[in-house]
């Protein structure tokens, strides 16, 4: 049986990551982008590195890019944490979402509609 996995010894290089992210932008003209990476509690996921590279690729193409860390129930990302995780991105680019106070219900998606658009994959 052929192995369907590969053990990485060195991880993905910045060049490989940039190449993959560039490929995702091919044929697209993006004006406004919101990136929602995990917060500092997931630092080791490398999401900050991915976000930073994506941010610079997008802004070089003229896109307005905002970043809103997905806090879940955690505290907002501090400036010190931001500078470690999201290297090269100004702290002011972060949109802080106050999950305790600023979540407003604007409607409800009926289950029947979800079933229809997902061809019964979601119930």
Predicted feature locations:
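N-terminal amphipathic/basic leader segments beginning at the initiator methionine
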Residues: 1-15
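Glycine-rich phosphate/diphosphate-binding loops that line cofactor/substrate pockets in enzymes
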Residues: 19-34, 61
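Small-residue-rich
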Residues: 31, 60-61, 70-73, 88, ...
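Short glycine-rich or small-residue beta-strand-to-loop segments that form or flank ligand, phosphate
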Residues: 32-44, 66-72
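An N-terminal, globular interaction/scaffold subdomain
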Residues: 38, 54-56, 63-67, 82
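Histidine-anchored nucleotide/phosphate-binding helix
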Residues: 43-62
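A generic structural motif
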Residues: 61-73, 93-101
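An acidic, phosphate/nucleotide-engaging active-site surface
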Residues: 77-123
